[in-house]
């Protein structure tokens, strides 16, 4: 261990080395004329230690784990996990950027967590050597009520309606091959034809209830195939 230099001894420029792990402030040298050298002169700027060389080493995985850098999750999700070489930062912020962990970045971590855990100043924005990953957006909508998909109502043209009404006047229910042939002739699907006949039967029954007296309200409409209406409605259900 070297003894401290006696008072009056002049310190030669370049004899002091920066402490490892920290950047010592540049001490302005005293010129021969008795005035202090400016810290913004060319000599003072060149004499400063290179920040990038000191920032080449990163903390090991055990240190990152002990500081809870890998498991911390951003509460507010305001800023993404900063993952770049600091080139995107302004000049006055990119000077004091130091790497904290050499592992891949974890989305959801922001600068506030690192400043609280490592007691860093505002200009020392920590970053990680890894690809840029933005924090996932948080959907603030209420997920308690799920929206049901609205059924699209089929629009029939005049020719299709006339043909459907003509067939319904003869037969109130179509099944199997007859329904498939009618759907192909009208350029519709079998499901569209089935739903139209179900709705038309409901409308027909309401009309019959208004016409008939109260004693015959529960009577079914007379048709050759009306006996199969209830069985089909029970299996498929009445749609709208």
Swiss-Prot record:
A Pfam family annotated for this UniProt entry: Homeodomain
Domain of life: Eukaryota
GO molecular function: sequence-specific double-stranded DNA binding
UniProt biased composition (Low complexity): 213-225
Localization of this protein: Nucleus
Gene3D superfamilies: Homeodomain-like (1.10.10.60)
Presence of the UniProt keyword Transcription in the record: yes
Designated name of the protein: Homeobox protein notochord
Gene: Noto
């Amino acid at each position: 261990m070297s003894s401290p230099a006696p008072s009056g001894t002049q310190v030669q420029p370049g004899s002091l080395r920066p402490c490892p792990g920290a950047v010592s402030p540049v001490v302005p040298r005293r010129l021969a004329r008795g005035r202090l050298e400016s810290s913004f002169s060319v000599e003072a700027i060149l004499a400063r230690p290179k920040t990038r060389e000191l920032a080449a080493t990163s903390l090991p995985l055990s240190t990152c784990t002990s500081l809870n850098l890998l498991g911390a999750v951003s509460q507010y999700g305001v800023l993404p996990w900063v993952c770049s070489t600091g080139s995107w930062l302004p000049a006055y912020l990119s000077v004091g950027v130091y790497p904290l962990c050499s592992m891949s970045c974890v989305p959801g971590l922001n600068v506030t967590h690192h400043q609280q855990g490592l007691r860093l100043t505002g200009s020392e924005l920590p970053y990680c050597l890894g690809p840029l990953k933005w924090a996932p957006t948080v959907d603030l909508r209420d997920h308690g009520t799920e929206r049901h998909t609205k059924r699209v109502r089929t629009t029939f043209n005049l020719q299709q309606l006339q043909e459907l009404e003509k067939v319904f006047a003869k037969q109130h229910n179509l099944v199997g091959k007859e329904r498939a042939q009618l759907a192909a002739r009208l350029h519709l699907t079998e499901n569209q034809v089935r739903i139209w006949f179900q709705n038309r039967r409901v409308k027909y029954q309401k009309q019959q209830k208004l016409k008939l007296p109260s004693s015959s309200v529960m009577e079914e409409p007379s048709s050759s195939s009306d006996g199969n209406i209830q069985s089909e409605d029970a299996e498929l259900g009445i749609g709208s």
